[in-house]
Curated annotation (Swiss-Prot):
Phosphorolytic 3'-5' exoribonuclease that plays an important role in tRNA 3'-end maturation. Removes nucleotide residues following the 3'-CCA terminus of tRNAs; can also add nucleotides to the ends of RNA molecules by using nucleoside diphosphates as substrates, but this may not be physiologically important. Probably plays a role in initiation of 16S rRNA degradation (leading to ribosome degradation) during starvation. It comes from Aquifex aeolicus (strain VF5). PROSITE patterns: RIBONUCLEASE_PH. Belongs to the RNase PH family. Its EC number is 2.7.7.56. This is Ribonuclease PH. Keywords: Nucleotidyltransferase, RNA-binding, rRNA processing, Transferase, tRNA processing, tRNA-binding. The gene is rph.
Length: 255
């Protein structure tokens, strides 16, 4: 039993509340336990210079954290005048994950700009951000189609992410901050609804792991990703390749 009462292979309670903000084309508030992230998707009628004239779109992402999202206040990166390496890494990870999910040639020469803002952090902020960002992006694409701006809903697959780690020689799913701080091995995995993996980040902290442990961690991550995607699926109706929103505004793993 873990400090928060979960089993080793158990996710924290997860909830997704769509349309959390009024103005973006897509938005949600996603919670992984105490970790809470606002994810938005904004449609910009432009693409980077290197894509102009090529007839395809782009998806990019920004990630930030409120100063008091953590137990001790952190200084805003905008005040420091630079974005840290961790933030750059997470932003790129979110962007890559979203581009895995969408056929960019079918959204026209426009950019979907994803913003993920952590309002409370207790571990797993990047995996929560990716899982929530998919909902924001999918809702934005459905809105574009409904308004007749694009001809299809070019969403290729669901995408979600989860953390796995080795803590006190035990392999655990969806680490909270306490567990993440003590982890011998930390892994973040991004996967799709078809069971494929799009990104795996793994590193040991003064600890080397075996191939058998790696496989066990990947298997556990796949279990968590499957559960997250089952939750995402409740928000959509898919028929003959066409995506529409379901009537649900909020889904939770506890209901």
């Amino acid at each position: 039993m873990r400090s928060d009462g979960r089993k080793e292979d158990q996710l924290r309670p997860v909830s997704i509340q769509r349309d959390f903000l009024e103005y973006p084309e897509g938005s949600c508030l996603i919670s992984f336990g105490k970790t809470k992230v606002i994810c938005t998707a904004s449609v910009i009628e432009n693409v980077p210079n290197w894509l102009k004239g090529k007839g395809q779109g782009w998806i990019t992402a920004e990630y930030s954290m409120l100063p008091r999202a953590t137990q001790q206040r952190t200084i805003r990166e905008s005040v420091q005048g630079r974005i840290g390496g961790r933030t750059h890494e997470i932003q790129r990870m979110i962007g890559r994950a979203m581009r895995t999910a969408v056929e960019l040639t079918k959204i026209g020469e426009r950019t979907i700009w994803v913003d993920c803002d952590v309002i409370q952090a207790d571990g797993g902020t990047r995996t929560a951000a990716i899982t929530g960002a998919f909902v924001a992006v999918a809702d934005a694409i459905i809105k574009l189609h409904k308004e007749g701006i694009i001809e299809e809903t070019p969403i290729k697959d669901f995408v979600a992410a989860v953390s796995v780690g080795i803590v006190n020689d035990r392999i655990l799913l969806d680490l909270n901050f306490e567990e993440d701080s003590a982890a011998q091995v930390d892994m973040n995995v991004v996967g799709t609804g078809s069971g494929r993996l799009s990104e795996v980040h793994t590193m040991g902290e003064e600890y080397s792991f075996t191939k058998d442990e790696l496989i066990k961690m990947l298997d556990l991550a796949q279990k968590g990703i499957n559960e997250l995607i089952e939750l995402q699926k409740k928000l959509y109706v898919i028929q003959d390749g066409k995506w529409e929103r379901s009537e649900l505004k909020e889904v939770s793993s506890t209901t």
